[in-house]
Swiss-Prot record:
Taxonomic classification: Eukaryota, Fungi, Dikarya, Ascomycota, Taphrinomycotina
The name this protein goes by in its record: Vacuolar protein sorting-associated protein 52
Keywords: Golgi apparatus, Membrane, Protein transport, Transport
One term of GO molecular function: syntaxin binding
Role: Involved in retrograde transport from early and late endosomes to late Golgi by linking the vesicle through the t-SNARE TGL1 to the Golgi, leading to the membrane fusion between late Golgi and endosomal vesicles.
Organism of derivation: Schizosaccharomyces pombe (strain 972 / ATCC 24843)
Length: 508
């Protein structure tokens, strides 16, 4: 029994060893498989890495190809004229915005042909670009031809009678100013010829229309004015009725009874002709109407020249003189005739103040080309104002008023009221004046001649007290009137008459 059991044990151990050997064999097979798999995996990994590198290279090449295609595509597109562009430039409506846009595209084509980049040089060598360049040049010449005709037609419009130049210039020239710039860039000689044609046309235009305007203003009844002395037989202006001449005579020396401000709404025009024919006008309204119309045209023309022709500072003065020289000469001639026949010192001084205001506005609005005209007008008006004031003074010196002693009363003389009105008006028109002007000297001479006249008038009375009372009342009237206005001139004249009055009081 015991031997049998031991034999069984040995038999069992043998089986286990066999199984272990089998497992080892299997394990060895597995290890061999794993080793082969690792080798295969390393090979596969190496292949994948190679594929990835190749893929990256392909992607880089693809991107480079796309970049080249994009660049070449742009060059090709830039070298080929679109059919609609050719049609628009050749036959399109030049007043339509599309023509302006087409001209900008054509300019891009023309400027693109001058590209000196390496890619541009490479492409310019292509036969297709050479052919397109010929077509672009032909289209450029067509555009130049049409622009020339367009501008010529516009300039001819300005030579039509009663034409309103402002809307034509705004809608046909300013709105399409790129047309002239294109012409100036690609055919400067023709552009300068058209500029000269415009200058010659506007030279004629302004001279013609201001000659017409002067004929219209010649129909206006202008109040010429009168001297300050009292005359029983003072003649009316333009054969006015007695009531009318008295009314205007009383207003000639009073600035407050005249229109105060002048602007484009107060300009004398054909539409106001009915009112003008029935109502005489003060000289300053005619003068200011003329200067306002002239200033309006000059300012508009100056702005147009700068915007459309893009002139330099030296060219501005030259072109402006070429356009307005004859007109300004005619203007000075007309104003000389208008003012030289007037003895309305208030109207002339108002014209001076208005011109000074225009000169200041010209500096503010940066229109320097018109300043010499204003300066020449002021230099002409001042001597005329002084001459008229001399007439007033001479009138007072030559006034031969004879009064009876009983007529020397405490009431101021009627002439004192007129002198007071004149001094008041001169002071009102000189409120803001700080520099020495001919007005102050003329006013002083007038006051002195007036005082001399009053003193001579009193010599017919032996009663010194009555003389002093009469003179004092006249001096008081004038100083009281001058109290209503400020400024150096008013203060100077008021002080003068107050001192005269004070001396009379001390004498009494």
């Amino acid at each position: 029994m015991q031997r049998a059991s031991t034999q069984d044990v040995y038999d069992g151990s043998g089986d286990d060893l066999n199984k272990l050997d089998s497992l080892k064999s299997v394990l060895n097979d597995v290890l061999s498989s794993l080793e082969r798999f690792q080798v295969d995996l390393d090979v596969a990994t190496s292949d994948i890495y190679k594929v990835s590198e190749r893929s990256n290279k392909i992607q880089v090449n693809l991107n480079n190809l796309k970049a080249v295609e994009s660049a070449l595509g742009a060059e090709i597109d830039g070298a080929i004229l679109p059919p609609d562009l050719i049609k628009t430039i050749s036959t399109g409506d030049m007043d339509h915005p599309s023509w302006n846009s087409a001209l900008e595209k054509l300019t891009s084509f023309l400027e693109g042909g001058e590209d000196d980049s390496s890619l541009g040089n490479m492409f310019n060598s292509l036969q297709i670009n050479k052919d397109q360049k010929k077509l672009v040049d032909k289209l450029r010449d067509k555009a130049i031809e049409r622009i020339r005709n367009y501008i010529v037609v516009t300039i001819k419009m300005f030579r039509q009678a009663f034409v309103d130049v402002f809307p034509i210039r705004k809608h046909r020239l300013i709105a399409n100013k790129n047309y002239y710039l294109f012409l100036f860039k690609f055919n400067r000689k023709l552009a300068l010829e058209l500029q000269r044609a415009y200058i010659n046309t506007m030279n004629w235009f302004y001279l013609y229309h201001f000659e017409q305007y002067s004929r219209f203003l010649d129909k206006v009844h202008v109040l010429k004015g009168e001297t300050i002395r009292v005359e029983e037989d003072r003649k009316g202006l333009f054969n006015l009725s007695k009531g009318a001449q008295q009314s205007y005579g009383n207003q000639m020396l009073s600035v407050n009874l005249r229109p105060q401000d002048f602007d484009m709404n107060s300009v004398l025009t054909a539409s106001t002709m009915h009112h003008i024919e029935s109502s005489p006008q003060y000289i300053e309204r005619v003068y200011c109407s003329w200067e306002l119309v002239l200033t309006e045209h000059v300012s508009s023309e100056y702005a147009f020249l700068l915007e459309y022709f893009n002139l330099s500072k030296d060219q501005q003065a030259t072109v402006f003189a070429a356009i307005f020289e004859k007109t300004l000469h005619f203007s000075r001639k007309y104003i000389t005739g208008l003012i030289s026949s007037s003895i309305d010192c208030i109207g002339i001084l108002k014209s001076i103040r208005f011109t000074q205001k225009l000169a200041l506005q010209a500096q503010t609005n940066i229109v320097p080309v018109i300043e010499p005209h204003y300066n020449s007008m002021i230099l002409f008006l001042w001597p005329r104002f002084q001459a008229v004031m001399d007439m007033h003074c001479e009138s007072l010196r030559k006034t031969n008023l004879s009064v009876k002693p009983e007529e020397i009363t405490s009431r101021p003389h009627p002439l004192s009221q007129r002198v007071a009105e004149l001094l008041y008006s001169l002071s009102m028109l000189s409120v803001n004046v700080v520099e020495a002007e001919p007005v102050a000297r003329s006013a002083s001479r007038l006051a002195q001649d007036y005082v001399s006249m009053l003193q001579n008038l009193c010599k017919t009375v032996n009663d010194k007290r009555r003389q002093s009372r009469f003179l004092s009342n006249n001096y008081t009237l004038i100083s009281t009137v001058l109290s209503g206005v400020s400024g150096n001139l008013a203060i100077e004249q008021k002080t003068y008459f107050e001192k005269l009055n004070e001396n009379l009081t001390n004498f009494q």
